[in-house]
Amino acid sequence: IVFYSVVTAFMVSHNIFNVYMIPYAMLPIIIRVFLDSRTAFLTHVITILICSISLRFPHEFILTQLAAGLVAIFSLRELSQRSQLFRTALLVILTYAAIYFAFELMTENGLANDFSKLNARMYTYFFINGILLLFTYPLLFLLEKTFGFTSNVTLVELSNINSDLLRQMSETVPGTFQHSMQVANL
């Protein structure tokens, strides 16, 4: 929470890039993988509310980030395959784009007749945000190794019967291998 608050305040005070480039949905994904959805949602809401203090348009930021965080949490029920993170990043990008487009339609100088007023740079920021969101997977690995956590992805990788150790075990001691696989599936 502190990291996102400091980065947001720094970017706003020094007018560096745009805060929509920061992957705020990374925090609820990490917390969702190791803990649960409620904790991830509460942490995300607290982070977004704290970060919105330093912004010019906090209501737009809060609604956009809240929607993206909810999509990230609920599209990632259990991280058991790497492809799920790609799908989540794509859904977050689409959520950002849809919410921002809706805000653009609601403004006074709306896009009712002229889509050339659309700020294409914002959609680039959303895409960069999605790319940065893909760095969640290596960060999860780093957190697992650093703090000794175990995620579902690690358990799936450990139960891969094509690994050298399990293949050797199935050839030399098939009974122990079968028993180990049954216990692992429990």
Language model segments and positions:
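Generic detector of multi-pass transmembrane helix bundles and their immediately adjacent loops
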Residues: V2-F177, M181
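An active-site-proximal "capping" alpha-helix that borders the catalytic cofactor pocket
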Residues: Q182-L186
